[in-house]
């Protein structure tokens, strides 16, 4: 009986304490006499300040975006480096190919020179030339320092210079014969024109090979081909020929 009364009293007290006016939320009894544990308080404070707020989310997004930007820039930098290395490798390959081609060309030239050397040695041996005991010096000159027309040291001593070979010998004019007319006399009455010494005539250009011969011919004869001959050189008739006495040939022993 007492138990039933005690339960009824607790139920009445509990209903009155936990009752709430209509329209309001259900009020729960406070825990631990209305005191909150310190651990729960710290957890709540740390949880709120840990990033559930708007500023924390923005900062984290900014950090992630900055990290993604750094990764993109690094990838672009690496891509440019790889492209530059690829171009450099291709250039080196081309240079190596050119060097290899030049090496093969030099090898062919060397083989040909060796064949010529062996041939010359056989020829000299057949003539009995003692070329192995002779001493000579080979002068190596840089390419482009002198032209291909420059004479070698051996030719400079044995052969005359090129200018001396091309220049014609100077000839002294022979004295005119007593019977020949003067240059200004004769039926034509024209003066002889001297041919210039540079090997040129009017309207005719001579090559260096033919110039010395042409100068020599014109200086020897001393007249032009289209000039009229003097009357003393014209052929006479048979009645104007001078008679020559016939001489008997001496008797042979």
From Swiss-Prot:
Region (Disordered): 49-72, 142-211, 234-253
Any single Pfam family the record assigns to this protein: INO80F
Residues modified as Phosphothreonine: 172, 207
GO biological process: apoptotic signaling pathway; chromatin remodeling; DNA recombination; DNA repair; positive regulation of apoptotic process; positive regulation of DNA repair; positive regulation of DNA-templated transcription; positive regulation of telomere maintenance in response to DNA damage
Glycyl lysine isopeptide (Lys-Gly) (interchain with G-Cter in SUMO2) crosslink, residue number(s): 216
InterPro entries: INO80F, TFPT
GO MF assignments: DNA binding
Superkingdom field: Eukaryota
PTM-bearing positions, type Phosphoserine: 167, 180, 188, 249, 252
Any single GO CC term annotated in Swiss-Prot or TrEMBL for this entry: Ino80 complex
Keyword Nucleus: yes
Function: Appears to promote apoptosis in a p53/TP53-independent manner. Putative regulatory component of the chromatin remodeling INO80 complex which is involved in transcriptional regulation, DNA replication and probably DNA repair.
Disease field: A chromosomal aberration involving TFPT is a cause of pre-B-cell acute lymphoblastic leukemia (B-ALL). Inversion inv(19)(p13;q13) with TCF3.
Protein name in the entry: TCF3 fusion partner
Protein's organism: Homo sapiens
